[in-house]
From Swiss-Prot:
Major localization listed first in the record, in broad terms: nucleus
Modified residues (Phosphoserine): S88
Crosslink position(s): Glycyl lysine isopeptide (Lys-Gly) (interchain with G-Cter in SUMO2): K80
Annotated Basic and acidic residues bias: 60-80, 191-212, 238-271, 335-344, 377-388
Gene Ontology cellular-component annotations: catalytic step 2 spliceosome; euchromatin; extracellular exosome; nucleus; supraspliceosomal complex
Protein name: RNA binding motif protein, X-linked-like-1
Residue stretches of biased makeup (Low complexity): 320-334, 359-368
Composition bias, Pro residues: 148-161
Length: 388
């Protein structure tokens, strides 16, 4: 890239810092007429940087000066004199920039493609028709979906309860998971539950009334159980909640999502469960609450209030657990049973008994949601939704 600068321009290097333009003119002026002398100086100190450019009117004079003065001493220093060349960076600099630019777009495209991935994952969720499958699949698949899925999901459910879901989701999304475990733990951990209970109780009344308001109920309950955080996801209650519950979430995630078609189902579940069957379950719960007999374990659970907590949590939990049925089985069995065990101190059988209720849950959730539940709960859900 080295190009000769304009003819007659010489580079003089190795100058003494004390040498100035006048000295250069005196030395080189004898070779011919000088058009320009550029002594390069430091911008800050204004001292010579030790090199200069001398331009002769005649290129021949420049050659003579270079031949004679190169290597000669000037002000005590040997100087270098040669034909000046254009800085390589000037010519070279312009070319390279474009490549980076050209590169940019690909990146963008790439990013875009990355973005597109989310929906597919969602599709994955969707494919899981079977809740149980979802869980299994989702559990393996779930975690990833969770990450990718939420965004897509946000598109879907959020609208329903977009407001709650959005904010909540974010908190629940991140916090949710931990909360989930926490939630579950909280399940286990009375402390959280107690606060929830109060809230829940509040919810309960609404629930009882609002109960029907599955949405409010779900969101409410859920929120109560999950501090709204998880439930806030209620919009995505199902999903989110599922999400919220880390395991459930994972399980659910895909399920929730997956079922987003299924999701609808899930939703049916969750909503439904919350709305219809859920409500039923809940009512049963409520009944259990009121009437321990219905769900023996529940009452023993920890008292109706606790039970409520449980139920709400569980319901909220379970509800959102569309998977409720399977997840529930999984989560429930694991989470809830665990919880149940810890909290309830119920014998394993009882815990297991839970699952049956769970089954009933599933049946009620599932049955209701799928059958009348879907229609009815859906309508309920619709109502709830409209509320939001």
């Amino acid at each position: 890239m080295v190009e000769a600068d304009r003819p007659g321009k010489l580079f003089i290097g190795g100058l003494n810092t004390e040498t100035n333009e006048k000295a250069l003119e005196a030395v080189f002026g004898k070779y011919g007429r000088i058009v320009e002398i550029l002594l390069m100086k430091d911008r800050e100190t204004n001292k010579s940087r030790g090199f200069a450019f001398v331009t002769f009117e005649s290129p021949a004079d420049a050659k003579d000066a270079a031949r004679d003065m190169n290597g000669k001493s000037l002000d005590g220093k040997a100087i270098k004199v040669e034909q000046a060349t254009k800085p390589s960076f000037e010519s070279g600099r312009r070319g390279p920039p474009p490549p980076p630019r050209s590169r940019g777009p690909p990146r963008g495209l790439r990013g875009g493609s990355g973005g597109t991935r989310g929906p597919p994952s969602r599709g994955g969720y969707m494919d899981d028709g079977g809740y149980s499958m979802n869980f299994n699949m989702s559990s393996s698949r779930g975690p990833l979906p969770v990450k990718r899925g939420p965004p897509p999901r946000s598109g879907g459910p959020p609208p329903k309860r977009s407001t709650p879901s959005g904010p909540v989701r974010s908190s629940s999304g991140m916090g949710g998971r931990t909360p989930v475990s926490r939630g579950r733990d909280s399940y286990g951990g009375p402390p959280r539950r107690e606060p929830l209970p109060s809230r829940r109780d509040v919810y309960l009344s609404p629930r009882d009334d609002g109960y029907s308001t599955k949405d409010s109920y779900s969101s409410r309950d859920y929120p109560s159980s999950r501090d709204t955080r998880d439930y806030a996801p209620p919009p995505r209650d199902y999903t989110y909640r599922d999400y919220s519950h880390s395991s459930s979430r994972d399980d659910y995630p895909s399920r929730g999502y997956g079922d987003r078609d299924g999701y609808g189902r899930d939703r049916d579940y969750s909503d439904h469960p919350s709305g219809g069957s859920y409500r039923d379950s809940y009512e049963s719960y409520g009944n259990s609450r009121s009437a321990p007999p219905t769900r023996g374990p529940p009452p023993s659970y920890g008292g109706s209030s606790r039970y409520d907590d449980y139920s709400s949590s569980r319901d909220g939990y379970g509800g959102s657990r569309d998977s409720y049925s399977s997840s529930r089985s999984d989560l429930y069995s694991s989470g809830r049973d665990r919880v149940g065990r810890q909290e309830r101190g119920l014998p394993p059988s009882m815990e297991r008994g839970y699952p049956p209720p769970r089954d009933s849950y599933s049946s009620s959730s599932r049955g209701a949601p799928r059958g009348g539940g879907r229609g009815g709960s859906r309508s309920d859900r619709g109502g709830g939704r409209s509320r939001y």
